[in-house]
Regions:
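Short amphipathic, positively biased membrane-proximal segments
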Residues: 1-148
Length: 148
């Protein structure tokens, strides 16, 4: 792992980090109604969240998004670490998509009209997995270049 992110990782880190940071900052200002909406949606897919008060859930989600977005934007956070966080976050969003009724077409993984906003988050999972494997790919490439 390197101290600073590789230049080739920065575009995906800036795009995803800026998007997630903005989302988190918006949620920091969530009123009771918005907190209840976020909580209701999430606890429908993840029932264990039902025991968490809506305001606490919204605040925790906001702080998590701000932290992840910031980590993605800071070049001294290793890409593998930032990628692991992004992949986990995106996996949670895709879990919402898969578990929430009405998000997918009947008998299909294809999104319904209501599911498109969540289904599109698959790009963040791909970005996270790419960052997670980036250092390993670079190490192999560098080793091959030295050997031959």
């Amino acid at each position: 792992m390197t101290v600073f992110s590789a230049l080739e990782d920065l575009p995906v880190r800036i795009a995803t980090g800026g998007f997630i940071l903005s989302s988190g900052l918006d949620k920091l200002e969530a009123d009771k109604e918005r907190a209840a909406g976020l909580h209701g949606f999430a606890s429908g897919a993840y029932p264990f969240l039902g025991s968490v008060p809506p305001e606490r859930f919204a605040k925790a989600l906001a702080v998590s998004e701000v932290g992840l977005g910031t980590a993605l934007l800071l070049p001294f956070v290793p890409s593998r670490l930032a990628g692991a966080g992004l992949a986990a976050f995106a996996g949670g969003l895709l879990g919402l998509y898969l578990r929430t009724p009405g998000m997918r077409r009947e008998g299909s993984l294809r999104p319904s009209e209501q599911g498109i906003p969540l289904a599109k988050d698959v790009w963040m999972l791909g970005a996270g997995l790419s960052l997670l494997t980036a250092d390993r790919r670079r190490t192999r490439r560098n080793r091959r270049n030295r050997e031959g």
